[in-house]
């Protein structure tokens, strides 16, 4: 069933009779669309909208086909190579299912083998630079922890977070503030990991909670927020918080 889509993309990229827009696209120019489509898949899942999920998965699949066709046009690889590579990877990572090994190697052993094959020396190699910063921090910390570079429990992680907060307060220049805020955020992600909390999900939930409360405050006011004191705004905020908590 994938063949019709592959043919559509081949025709769109045809140098003579294809679509002018599709013809000139590169990996770099469509990369933002690939990221956007992945987020739209996640959004459809979050909204439990199966019709939208079906459509968004199709859009994401199109991105895979598009990148594969761009690669095929320059002789690098094609869609079948992509499929073969992921099939090989999944088979390699599940020898207890697809192989004859009685005891499967550990996950890190498998990943280390893959990194060696791809020329990656560090346990942190291969974590995509294009990931959202919060998600990339989580992945980097998990990678480091898997090879033993981690605090033994939550207590020193909490201490580190407080230490970073103090360093933010002590910063004396914009550059120092920038750096220390980054360290503070990184430490907060690390604390979330030690509590087995997905920091990305937790921040998304907190942002949505703020949005609901703010919308309620906004709807209840009969004057501009800029005309109100911080005490008045805090009072309205607490009302909105109580209202939402009561259901």
Short names for language-model regions:
Residues 1-56, 62-181, 185-247:
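Flexible "arm" and connector segments at domain edges
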């Amino acid at each position: 069933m994938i063949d019709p889509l592959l043919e559509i993309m081949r025709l769109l990229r045809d140098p003579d009779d294809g679509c002018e827009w599709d013809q000139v696209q590169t990996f770099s120019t469509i990369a933002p669309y690939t990221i956007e489509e992945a987020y739209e898949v996640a959004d459809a899942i979050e909204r439990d909208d199966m019709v939208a999920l079906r459509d968004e998965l199709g859009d994401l699949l199109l991105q895979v086909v598009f990148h594969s066709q761009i690669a095929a046009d320059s002789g690098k690889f094609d869609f079948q190579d992509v499929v073969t590579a992921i099939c090989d990877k999944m088979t390699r990572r599940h020898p207890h299912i697809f192989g004859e090994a009685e005891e499967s190697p550990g996950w890190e052993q498998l990943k280390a083998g893959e990194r060696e094959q791809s020329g990656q020396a560090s346990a942190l190699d291969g974590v995509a630079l294009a990931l959202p910063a919060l998600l990339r921090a989580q992945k980097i910390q998990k990678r480091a922890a898997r090879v033993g570079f981690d605090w033994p429990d939550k207590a020193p992680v909490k201490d580190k977070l407080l230490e970073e907060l103090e360093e933010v307060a002590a910063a004396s220049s914009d550059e120092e503030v920038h750096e220390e805020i980054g360290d503070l955020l990184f430490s907060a992600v690390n604390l979330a990991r030690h509590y087995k909390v997905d920091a990305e999900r937790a921040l998304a939930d907190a942002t949505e909670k703020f949005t609901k409360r703010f919308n309620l405050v906004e709807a209840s006011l009969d004057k501009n927020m800029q005309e109100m004191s911080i005490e008045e705004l805090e009072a309205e905020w607490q009302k909105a918080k109580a209202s939402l908590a009561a259901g």
